[in-house]
């Protein structure tokens, strides 16, 4: 299983969290899409934006994104195999930690019980509960 940048952009149509976000939005400067591959079979996908502040909604995410932000914001993740979502988040965070000047790993998550259980069971802490989202933080020492 290996981490790659996503090149098959048709896969973003499968995004259950933010299907309305375009490829242009997801690949703008300061944003990246990664996938977890096993034998050329995509197991999970994550979209990341870099900021210097914690965004509370998509509008702030768009405004705050910059190429060299110190915060990696995971704003959508989905998987095609059991356990792949967890591995996707942790492997991506590890890759970013080792290759970019990022100090914090934050999510911009929907206010759902599924998102809450997913992030808390993977070691994240609830950072803040917003009107339209919840931010979870993955402690650096976990990564």
Where are each of the predicted segments found?
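Conserved catalytic-core motifs of GNAT/GCN5-like acyltransferases
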Residues: 125-137
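Non-catalytic substrate-recognition and accessory regions of acyl/acetyltransferase enzymes
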Residues: 1-69, 78, 100-103, 134-143
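Acyl-donor binding region in acyl/amide transferases
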Residues: 58-123
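Short glycine-aromatic motifs
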Residues: 30-31, 123-125
């Amino acid at each position: 299983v290996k981490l790659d940048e996503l090149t098959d952009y048709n896969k973003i149509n499968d995004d259950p969290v933010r299907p309305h976000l375009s490829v242009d939005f997801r690949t703008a400067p300061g944003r990246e899409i990664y996938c977890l591959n096993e034998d050329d079979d995509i197991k999970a996908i994550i979209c990341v934006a870099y900021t210097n502040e914690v965004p509370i909604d998509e509008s702030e995410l768009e405004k705050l994104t910059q190429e060299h932000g110190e915060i990696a914001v995971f704003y959508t993740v989905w998987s095609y195999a059991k356990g792949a979502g967890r591995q996707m988040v942790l492997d991506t965070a590890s890759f970013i930690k080792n290759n970019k000047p990022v100090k914090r790993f934050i999510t911009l998550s929907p206010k759902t019980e599924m998102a809450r259980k997913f992030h808390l069971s993977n070691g994240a802490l609830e950072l803040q509960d917003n009107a339209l989202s919840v931010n979870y933080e993955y402690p650096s020492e976990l990564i």
